[in-house]
Amino acid sequence: MAERPGSPGSREMRLLTFRDIAIEFSLEEWQCLDCAQQNLYRDVMLENYRNLVSLGIADSKPDLITCLEQNKEAWNIKRNEMVAKHPVTCSHFTQDLHPEQGIKHSLQKVIPRTYGKCGHENLQFKKCCKSVGECEVHKGGYNEVKQCLSNTQNKIFQTHKCVIVFGKFSNCNRHETRYTGKKHFKCKKYGKSFCMPSHLNQHQIIHTKEKSYKCEECGKSFKRSSNCTTHKRIHTGEKPYRCEECGKAFRWPSNLTRHKRIHTGEKPYTCEECGQAFRRSSTLTNHKRIHTGERPYKCEECGKAFSVSSTLNDHKRIHTGEKPYTCEECGRAFNCSSTLKTHKRIHTGEKPYKCEECDKAFKRHSSLAKHKIIHTGEKPYKSK
């Protein structure tokens, strides 16, 4: 549906299609993306298509979506010509923003996106710089520009050397919604309103607990394809994040970051009560319960409470009789991993607990504590 041409303020108004918001790459462009950027691209395109489906706009499934769902390379799909020939302006901004002439096949130059018309003129933004904050030409108006673009789609173009902010919008009302902050998209179930249909879609996923991405191996479902991809490493054994110091590999980058602190000695989490420092925030949280006396983990069988969930899990095995930790040396089984670890010292002869007074070493910390009484003369057990 379009207004009559020639009248003041005439503008093209039509339904948004997936082709309007699709971003497509050549082989050269696709190879410029690292693995994380390619995964992000897939997530964004699939999310955009789901948004159109939820609004009843999408017709037949595009080849690009079929390709992405099958994890095929996106550049196999023929690209559309999406380059404006003339400088364009937006009525919300005073300066002209010119698209680059002679676009090269590289993400570090310009990858345009096309939408339709907004107001009197098309709307395009393009500026290359090291980061969004360093965008000199658009520094004053960037916050407004940012409102006019999908946050998830912007992420794709934040490459190492170049930030591309590029777009047109097919609907002036859609553009003004982002600009003014008006919320036209309402959740029928809870009444909450959103500026963008994608935000409404994300909200609906939360309260419907929809999980679209399923692991074929174990059946576990996830809200994001990236989370499903990461989860699959449990089954495949893939550990792509390797420590340069010792060669140990990890499934997740966060685990590698924590591991590196072993080499650096960094302990960024400090207890305000006693000053003891820890490598992990979770360890600090558990430690604080020593001072507060909090024991939030309670055994339903006997009522005994614990400060750490793992200790409760170990305790429960007393009731069930389960002993999942077996010594490979002698076959003896234990109900918790720490007990097995201590037991193994019988076979290895390891004695990690050393007395500072006489250098005598022990397999158990409790044995060292008892030994120290010899030096202190302390008599903890009084006869009645």
UniProtKB/Swiss-Prot annotation:
SMART domains: KRAB (SM00349), ZnF_C2H2 (SM00355)
Location of the KRAB domain: 16-87
GO molecular function: DNA-binding transcription factor activity, RNA polymerase II-specific; RNA polymerase II cis-regulatory region sequence-specific DNA binding; zinc ion binding
One GO term describing the cellular component: nucleus
InterPro entries: C2H2-ZF_Transcription_Reg, KRAB, KRAB_dom_sf, Znf_C2H2_sf, Znf_C2H2_type
Location relative to the cell: Nucleus
PROSITE patterns for the chain: KRAB, ZINC_FINGER_C2H2_1, ZINC_FINGER_C2H2_2
Chief location: nucleus
GO biological process terms, semicolon-separated: regulation of DNA-templated transcription
Function: May be involved in transcriptional regulation.
Name of the protein this chain belongs to: Zinc finger protein 722
Species this protein is from: Homo sapiens (Human)
Organism classification: Eukaryota, Metazoa, Chordata, Craniata, Vertebrata
Gene encoding the protein: ZNF722
